[in-house]
Regions:
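Beta-propeller blade repeat segments, especially FG-GAP/WD-type strand-to-loop junctions
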Residues: 24-34, 84-124, 159-174, 216-219, ...
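Bacterial N-terminal signal peptides
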Residues: 11-21
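Hydrophobic beta-strand segments that make up the repeating blades of beta-propeller
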Residues: 76-80, 147-156, 202-206, 276, ...
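Beta-propeller blade termini
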Residues: 60-70, 109-110, 135-150, 162-164, ...
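Gly/Ser/Thr/Pro-enriched helix-cap/hinge segments flanking short amphipathic alpha-helices
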Residues: 24-31, 49, 53, 367-372, ...
Length: 577
């Protein structure tokens, strides 16, 4: 059957359904509304640019949504920049910060009143004790000491920091004690239990060796001076730290094998890609081949990316990989990969066959042409309307002045609009950005993206960071029209989310829906670890099966829909014994 004819019949029908849903909203709102300004989220990113075209100034920054105070709702962490360059002062800033702005990372506590729809955030950075004044790039969340309180790892252009959550609203800098500093340029990282001992280890992706004291001048195709690309600098090796369980980490980078192959990392995601119940690590590199580190179960990893089909695109070319997201978008039970790339390169979708071998299905699924005009960074799989199918977010912003579509006198013309794609039953994606609301019509220099149920109403919201611009909080307006099921997958004590667990929603007809417990992926960002299943019109009791790291399984039945459930390890019915 002719594929083009199939597309012509499927796409309009799908789009018609979405248009009907949007039009039916009595408030006139589209898929998302912007709630940052009205909620007290007053953060504006400052990149410190002074006209020297330093590469770091266009690369930040990520964001995080996480429940730091364990009150049941998601708080927000935003990374900040500062003046950059030897001897540079605020008086030289081309885009100066707001008068009185404190140029450090910011922590916002979610103070939304129970049962209220209006979100409220309070800046509690000073109270928290967090003094993260580095040039922020990325943030990673996880409970490193299994006390039930989420900790923070901050990746910087410069020294990184590990902030331990004290459980009383404050944090302590334990970077030196823990032994996880890296003075180079880090962007994305991931907490992952590589040896299945119950303690989260840490993978840190490092970018390039950039010397602020002797920056290289670069020029565009028009010979005008422009931002350099990564090829002008030497790539850096990544780091892997093994959690000893006593608050310290061992650097096992060399003996694990990950320093043997490397290439300017910007994105990191951990998942079981080959189906052996052990976590693997995928690294997205900028302009160089990517790595798929398969866990050998003895503390070492093997890069299988070239053989697995995920080191380069279908034409054998490495791409400028920025962000990465892993999830089961097609409902076959394995982890697929989506990569964001540079303008005039397509973003790339790698489809897993279940054994860790992948096919580039970018063109077949409709994700290629739509991405060509954009340089894309943060990305996430999210079920916008709770129909059970994972849709796709891509946030965009240029990286060179040459990318400007028209001549302009603006000093920072890198802004682009963001994109949203609807999943057509795992077969194709249709861009629905125009239906998503005014927030997707705005242009910005977007970098980080994190997702989570910010208002706890049962659908996925979006937080986007913008370089030299305000953070954008996009609240979902359509997801709760369908039924949903929220799950927290916890240890036996009911304290910590067990990263790497897989959860299957068992359905009477059709294959199970699989989701992974994680916070990593995107670009320098961290998302909600809770699982949210879209149930469509099925509002009855639900059954889920949890596959714990290592392969043990438990099942829970009779879970009421349209609410969150906390499932403790050991409290379900054992499966497969």
């Amino acid at each position: 059957m002719n594929k083009s004819r199939v597309r012509k019949t499927v796409v309009p029908a799908f789009c018609f359904c979405l248009l009907t849903a949007v039009a039916a909203d009595e408030t006139g709102a589209a898929l998302f509304i912007e709630a940052g300004e009205t909620s007290g989220l007053d953060f504006v990113h400052f990149n410190g640019m002074s006209g020297e075209l330093y590469l770091p100034e266009i690369m930040g920054a990520g964001v995080a949504v996480f429940d730091f105070d364990r009150d049941g709702d998601l708080d927000i962490y935003l990374l900040q920049g500062h003046m950059i360059g030897p001897g540079k002062t605020l008086g030289e800033a081309i885009l100066p910060p707001k008068k009185g702005a404190v140029l450090t990372d910011r922590l916002y506590r979610n103070d939304t009143a129970p049962g209220k729809s209006r979100l409220r955030f309070t800046d509690v950075t000073k109270k928290s004790g967090i003094t993260a004044g580095g040039y922020g790039m990325g943030v990673t969340t996880g409970d490193i000491n299994n006390d039930g309180w989420t900790d923070l790892y901050i990746s910087n252009f410069g020294h990184n920091q590990l902030w331990l959550n004290n459980g009383d609203g404050t944090f302590k800098d334990i970077t030196d004690k823990a032994g996880v500093d890296d003075p180079r340029w880090s962007v994305s990282a991931a907490f992952v239990d590589i040896d299945l001992d119950g303690w989260l280890d840490l993978y840190v992706g490092n970018y390039v060796a950039y010397d602020m004291g002797n920056p290289k001048p670069c020029r565009s195709a028009t010979t005008a001076r422009d931002y350099c690309g990564p090829q002008a600098f030497a790539p850096l090796t990544d780091r892997l730290f093994l959690n000893r369980g006593d608050g310290s980490f061992e650097d096992i980078s060399e003996k694990s094998g990950i320093t043997g192959v490397f290439g300017g990392a910007l994105g990191v995601v951990a998942a079981d890609f080959d189906g052996d119940h052990w976590p693997d690590i995928y690294v997205a590199n900028d302009g160089m081949a990517n790595q798929l580190w398969i866990n050998q179960k003895d503390g070492t990893f093997e890069d299988t990316a070239p053989l697995a089909g995920v080191s380069v695109n279908r034409y054998g070319m490495p791409e400028a990989s920025m962000g990465v997201a892993a999830a089961d978008f097609d409902g076959d039970g394995d982890e697929d990969l989506f990569m964001t790339h540079l303008v005039r390169e397509t973003n790339t979708l790698y489809v897993n066959d279940g054994t860790g071998w992948f096919d580039d299905k970018t063109a077949e699924t409709g994700l290629g042409v739509a991405s060509l005009p954009y340089s894309s960074f943060g990305t996430a799989w999210l079920d916008i309307d709770n129909d059970g199918w994972l849709d796709l977010l891509s946030v965009n912003g240029a990286v060179t002045l040459f990318e400007s579509h028209e001549p302009t006198d603006r000093v920072f013309p890198l802004d682009r609009r963001n994109q949203l794609f609807a999943n057509d039953h795992g077969k194709a994606f249709i861009e629905i950005s125009d239906l998503a609301g005014d927030a997707f019509k705005l242009s910005a220099v977007s970098r980080g993206a994190a997702i989570g149920d910010i208002d706890n109403d049962g659908d996925i919201d979006i937080l986007i960071s913008n370089n030299s611009g305000p953070a954008r909080l996009l609240v979902n307006q359509v997801g709760t029209r369908n039924a949903w099921l929220g799950i927290s997958i916890l240890d036996a004590a009911g304290k910590s989310h067990i990263t790497g667990s897989k959860v299957a929603l068992i359905r009477v007809t059709g294959q199970p829906l699989w989701r992974r417990v994680h916070t990593d992926g995107s670009y320098g960002s961290a998302s909600d670890p809770r699982i949210l299943f879209g149930l469509g019109g099925n509002r009855g009791p639900q059954t889920v099966e949890v596959s714990w790291p290592g392969g043990e399984r438990e099942r829970w039945s009779g879970l009421a829909s349209n609410r969150y459930h906390a499932l403790r390890r050991g409290s379900g019915i054992r499966v497969g014994e």
